[in-house]
Amino acid sequence: MNETECTQCGRIHKHLQEIRNKYPDYHCKPVWGTGSLNSRICIFGLAPGLHGANKTGIPFTADFSGQLIREIIEELDLDEYFITNVVRCYPEKNLPQTSEKNNCQTYNFQELSRLQNLKVIITLGEVAYRQIIKLYDIEYNTHKFKHGNVVKLNEKINLISSYHCSKLNINTHKI
């Protein structure tokens, strides 16, 4: 994927310029997925964290959620995985608008189509879940989000839904 600055979402683009002024060393550009293209597992979160991937340019790094998910991956001894977000840029207050989520669907499709051995997609949070089932033309009304649910996306790929590993969800004992 390309590291160029995206201007497709005007609100996010403006917000990233403000963040760049405050934190000149931050990445403040689209954050693309990373990991093995031979992976059978792909993990989708919501969006880069302000002081995480938005800072480093690498998904799930430098913040609470990143540290937690990477500890879990290490504990599970996963050698090959791919990790990304359904929204590529940090949205204001970490709340992407519908148009911003939809603007990234092309990138979600592109990243997934590069993973030829993919068997399982894990979504962290309901927003990621909704975007992925939408990508596979599955109706939310018939497949509502539920932590731990498994949805067959097609003949070779299953989706597992999980609550997001955010500090809020941990501190409120949601997970």
List where the protein language model places each region.
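A polyanion-binding, active-site-adjacent surface
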Residues: M1-F145, N149-L153, I157-I175
